[in-house]
Amino acid sequence: MDKGGKTDMGVRHWKTGRRILAVMLAGCMLLSSAGCGGSSQAGSENAGAQEEPEGAGREGQSGSGDEGQDGMQEEGQAGSENGASDGAQDGMAGGNKAGEATEEITDVTDTIPLNVIDDSYRTYYEVFVYSFCDSDGDGIGDLQGLISKLDYINDGDDSTDTDLGCNGIWLMPVNPSPTYHKYDVMDYYDIDAAYGTMEDFQELLAACERRGIKVIMDLVLNHSSSQNPWFMEACDYLRELGDGEPDVSECPSFAYYHFSKEKGAGCYAVEGTDWYYEAQFYSEMPDLNLDSEALRTEIEKIAGFWLDLGVGGFRLDAVKEFYTGNPKANIEFLSWFTGVVKERKEDAYLVGEAWLGISDYAQYYESGIDSLFNFAFADKGGIISKVVNGSPASRYGAESAALQETFGQYNENYIDAPFYTNHDMGRSAGYYAGENSEKQTKFAGAMNLLMSGSAFLYYGEELGMKGAGKDENKRAPMYWSKDAEKEGMCAGPPDMDAFEMKFDSLEEQEQESDSIYHYYKKVIRIRNQNPEIARGEVTYLEELSGDSFCVLRKQWEDSEIMLIFHTGEGTEELDLKNLTLNGAEISEKSIRGTLETGEEKVVVTGQKAVMPSYSILVLK
């Protein structure tokens, strides 16, 4: 649910699946001077899990931008814990003395209402429709399948806590295409027949609007399909032209592409002519000529068509390749397109993919685009993975704070777009091996979701899905069930390797209170309860941070929140003396949430925090 799970302040909301651990005798609590400690169950970690092999780069056919992984110099940390952080404030102490009658204390997050704001700071769920949910049994996911699973993403009901709580969906391409991934568009004004109809798409938008979900769709403007009528008409025209000179008044689409009689890098022959066309990604993906005024007019029509239907914005593919090797021209086009979209729909959200190092992609904010994906923290070589695998926790905080200055110098209104993995990267469950791999998988996911900006979550990451190597493996079917024949299950992309998942399917994880799935739900809930997390200006508290601790303060408007990440493998204590939040000293009453990845709970006593391995404390 988007704004879901609100409860009146002070009222305990007992979640489904929580259990009373011991029956309380009448008057027991009043007579017991010792009180009751909150007991907890945590999950057994996947002790022998082996790390999956990491894939080599992206296939040329992905069409999703440059293959080069950005080389980030800094790394950093954050963390989180399973959704069963049962004894938040009074009951966080763990076990109780022998003979004491106790009950499990409701998590503090259950008593805090959601505070979801309808703006551009959201939690987006990336959906590859092909592999998400199949409604008609043909093995291919479709729009009706996605509609049937919207309640999983967000049911729009504040009285429930059974959904993830994402309030945005990023749809990978849904336009007609000859390939499974659909990053080569044949028709920019329609829906691929394998996914459904335009009526299905409109039904999806209406269902999302009722739930408070903003839908952004992938818009591929760097290139089209070679089967796009624009390209086919231009090639036919050149064949008929013979030795004559092209005239765009005779064939307007000739100007939509880069045709030349000289073969340059990344160029391919137009069969039956002495002409060549540019296609930097793949021969069947001819590059569009974005200098063409006629094409820009067409692009303006395309954007307006989808915005008028109710789409909330666009994810722009491969923005650094619009004019390969020419950042200035790329930024100029982005600036033009941003202006076109905002004039049509002021609150439309735009996020661009510029797979570059931070100092290089930061300059694209000069275009005025809302967001750029934060590649610095993503993937196996990014800051999050490095910190979880042993780099100093402090580097997560230092880099988080530094980003503000780097991006802000180009656009003070930027909105960061942190993500951990996407359809071009190996899935994060393969980044970690050994007895702590499940803890690390959880913790790393929280590090991403607790960052400022609009956070993005790739479908299935909340289950710890596996997938590496070639692109098809990274886009495996959503793991609803271990039964591949179960209703809704997809067959997966053609040529996908056969492999087993590392962690349980959703069916099992829903029943496991300490699962990765429940952990992710809790992280998103904390994000939705505290708008400072997404919107706050970051202050890195270097004096409290180090190898195993990272402490961040975020301020939004007149409110502050503090995030403490502990990456150490043992339990450690952090002194919070002399620290204040919102004008008050920190105490047990400051707790807004705890995220643990094992049985041991985070405890705040006085002005000290005792934190087990891979845990997070949220204070306000």
Which positions does each model-derived feature cover?
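Loop/helix patches that line or flank the sugar-binding groove of alpha-linked glycan CAZymes
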Residues: D119, R344, F419-N422, G434-E573, ...
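C-terminal beta-strand-rich structural cap/linker in extracellular carbohydrate-active enzymes
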Residues: V602-K620
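Short, low-complexity, disordered segments immediately C-terminal to signal peptides
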Residues: G37-M72
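Bacterial N-terminal signal peptides that target proteins for export
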Residues: D8-M24
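Conserved alpha/beta catalytic core and glycan-binding cleft of carbohydrate-active enzymes
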Residues: S226-Q227, M232-E233, Y237-E262, T338-G339, ...
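C-terminal motif of bacterial Sec signal peptides marking the signal peptidase cleavage site
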Residues: S32-G35
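Beta-strand-rich binding/interaction modules
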Residues: T571-T597
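Acidic/aromatic-lined carbohydrate-recognition and catalytic surfaces
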Residues: G37-G43, G91, G99-T297, D308, ...
